[in-house]
Amino acid sequence: RLSIHAIYGDFGGKKVDRNEIEPKHFQSWIDWAKANDMKLDFNSTSFSHPLSGDQSLSSRDKAVRDFWIEHTIRSRKIADEMGRQLNDKACHNLWIHDGSKDLTVDRYLYRSLLKDSLDKIFATKCPNVKDAVECKLFGTGLESFTVGSHEFYMGYAVKNGIMATLDMGHFHPTEETYDKISAMLLFTPEILLHVSRPVRWDSDHVVILNDSVQMLAQEIVWADALNKVNIGLDYFGASINRIGAYVIGSRATQKAFLQALLSPIKQLRDYESSGRFFQRLALLEESKSMPWAAVYDYFCLKNNAPAAEDYIATIEQYEKEVTSKR
């Protein structure tokens, strides 16, 4: 799957404002997806615009709110058309930057305005869309207050039966996303997940096979929730070869889920249920060095993909022959 933002439309060189976008501006993406056996997801885009400011859907200015409400309604309709043509529901993720750099005395007002905007947006039914709302602890320049906090969107998602988006970089550095999976799934039908690697803040470093990603995969697999969690990768890696970044992050995530699927979970649960906690910890540690890498290499070979580190040479060759000449 590929998830794209509303600013990535094929506008034919014409200026099309955010509240004017239509499915026709993304038909070339849909055609490309059909030709490449891909599915598409979509994101409304409230940042980097003259009307962005510090608030969009929670702005005190009704004209500004109405502009972004219209943009988001149109974004959901575009996602709906993607899902219809590709015969697979498209996730539409709603994240806004709204907040305040310094102390605010009107938190309740801003959140009330956001709730009202969301109610108007979701009043339009889109049968081919999976809707999601995404929280964030803070943003650069908006350190003191974020309108769309975790508690706000968690409450809204539960009340309205839509997905909450959990981004690994959008929480406090000591807060682990994997611990939220089982709690959220008891109250929401599905979750949208953004797998990332925050380094001290929401830096979106390239995903690697670290403890956070491994434990996230374990929680999803062990909760039998693979069909309830929509897994998206959210990182940049602009300082290194972009294709290399894609491959490293994608393979790291695949490896994490493979490890979880191969783990001796029945034995681990037997140890836990019988109070044998030394044995549980010992087997958890031993499972880290089990020969899962050989299974992953076999998976790559079966799919005509380079195994182990062989992809390095493949990407270097592509960089030399293709990307360096652009």
Where are these regions (language model features)?
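Active-site capping/gating regions of soluble enzymes
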Residues: 1, 106-318
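N-terminal "assembly arms/tails" that initiate or stabilize quaternary assembly
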Residues: 14-15
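Residues that line or immediately flank small-molecule/substrate-binding pockets and catalytic motifs
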Residues: 6, 96, 197
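Catalytic domains of carbohydrate-active enzymes, especially glycoside hydrolases
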Residues: 1-7, 32
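Active-site acidic/histidine proton-transfer and metal-coordination neighborhood
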Residues: 19-164, 267, 283-285
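N-terminal, charged low-complexity regulatory/assembly segments
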Residues: 9-11
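Catalytic domains of carbohydrate-active enzymes that cleave complex glycans
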Residues: 315, 321-326
